[in-house]
């Protein structure tokens, strides 16, 4: 299993070519050679194919909110959606510094995107209602959640607060 811990993202950002080597026993076999890394190598499953044109028709020109925008899943959503020409991105996260990093990435790669960075906790109903009223998102991608199950089994009340009650507030 490939453990990336952000390493792959850093290599890609530096425009470094990433290769994979087949298992030692397979070296030299027909079709087994050093090759460019594929998404399947990282996911260890077959990728899901999506109709990007269909998705783009829902995103282009729309106000899109992404909660958990500075997390690993949310940040990838930001990247994917930024390329689909939304009217406005409303990016919500409780982590100020990582959200600032998302802002810098947007400025580097999608300078023309109108993006609003909002530091907010999805469990704060008053704040979230204010954000919905002020920005009127047409679509919401809710990625604000705790995802490390074994750790959250020892922190059940926090997991329920964010993953369940936070989702109810967003809904």
Residue map of PLM features:
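Flexible, Lys/Arg-rich cytosolic regulatory linkers and terminal tails that connect or flank
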Residues: 4-63, 70
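A short helix-to-beta-strand connector/capping loop
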Residues: 14-16, 110-115
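Conserved NAD(P)H cofactor-binding loop of Rossmann-fold oxidoreductase domains
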Residues: 143-147
């Amino acid at each position: 299993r490939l453990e990336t811990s952000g390493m792959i993202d850093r290599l890609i950002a530096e425009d470094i070519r990433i290769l994979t080597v087949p298992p030692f026993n397979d070296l030299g076999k027909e079709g087994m050679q050093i090759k460019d890394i594929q998404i399947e190598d990282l996911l260890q499953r077959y990728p899901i194919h999506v109709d990007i044109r269909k998705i783009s028709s829902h995103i282009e020109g729309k106000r899109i909110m992404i909660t958990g925008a500075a997390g690993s899943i949310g940040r990838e959503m930001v990247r994917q959606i930024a390329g689909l020409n939304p009217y406005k991105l409303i990016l919500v996260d409780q982590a100020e510094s990582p959200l600032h990093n998302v802002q810098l990435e947007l400025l580097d790669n999608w300078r023309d995107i109108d993006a609003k960075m909002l530091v907010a906790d999805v469990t704060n109903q008053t704040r979230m209602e204010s954000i919905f009223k002020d920005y009127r998102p047409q679509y919401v991608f809710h990625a604000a959640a705790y995802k490390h199950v074994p750790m959250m089994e020892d922190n059940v009340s926090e997991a329920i607060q964010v993953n369940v009650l936070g989702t109810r507030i967003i809904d």
